[in-house]
Amino acid sequence: SSAASDVYKRQISTQANNTNYMTYKFWYEHGAKRVVSARELSLAEISEIRANIPDDMEIESFVHGAMCISYSGRCLLSNYFTGRDANHGACTHPCRWKYSIVEETRPGEYMTVNEDDRGTYIFNSKDLCMIEYVPEMVAAGIDSLKIEGRMKTALYVATVARTYRKAIDDYFESEEKYRSNMEYYKSEIAKCTYRQFTTGFYFGKTDSDSQIYDSNTYVKNYTYIGTVRQVTDDGCVCFEQKNKFSVGECVEAMDFNGDNIECTVEAIYDEDGALMESAPCLLYTSPSPRDGLLSR
């Protein structure tokens, strides 16, 4: 209904194969106000779309995260192998798994195509990272930057989203400020699990450098250990633990206001107030800074 359209803005997924301005116009004529561009588009092609669609139509484009190996994300591997549908936001990333080649008349005989002793990574794309190119994305006429976050932790989502938010705000305040803070942006993103980075298709066709051939693992510099749920009157926090940690370890708290605070775990108490040396995945209270996410 028209009333519903006024309340809920219709947005079209990247999986609708939105690769040219005629597609955008089609969706606009059917009530869509925002369309997510296909990952295969370059910034030049997005600029062309922007120049040929209504001014009040919004373009959303991916700025960071895993790159789907399938065209416009339309992949059935996850659904076929695990019953979890990528087209409904539940992709299990089978493109990251190891694969071997078997000739159908020789079952059990694996071809020697391995890059290492664990398999060959024929679908293993690097992760997209456009933190250095926010001005170019703005200049292309993109209205919203999309961060891919499937199967990611709260720490990943919070850190990456906060970093790009700061980068965008810094750029609109001053390009000089944005450039001067680049190492900070990169260091924050490096705290999350990630693969090697690429700029995807934004500057033209990809080449062999956009793939990872020797590993299927993530780079992991920090461990997400928990989420602060409550701050007590005596300066402690009650938090939900995600990974084990111990008294004496140095941890970093990511505050909601954007600050990172390093501190040492002085003590850990269980729900009954008993002291513990380490925390094996329950609810705990510990002296710590304000609300936020904890990592080490």
Task: State the predicted function of each range.
Residues 25-286, 290, 296:
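Surface-exposed amphipathic alpha-helical tracts and adjacent flexible/coil segments at the periphery
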Residues 2-11, 284-291:
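Conserved small/polar residues in nucleotide/adenosyl-binding loops
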Residues 5, 11-19, 33-41:
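Catalytic beta/alpha-barrel core
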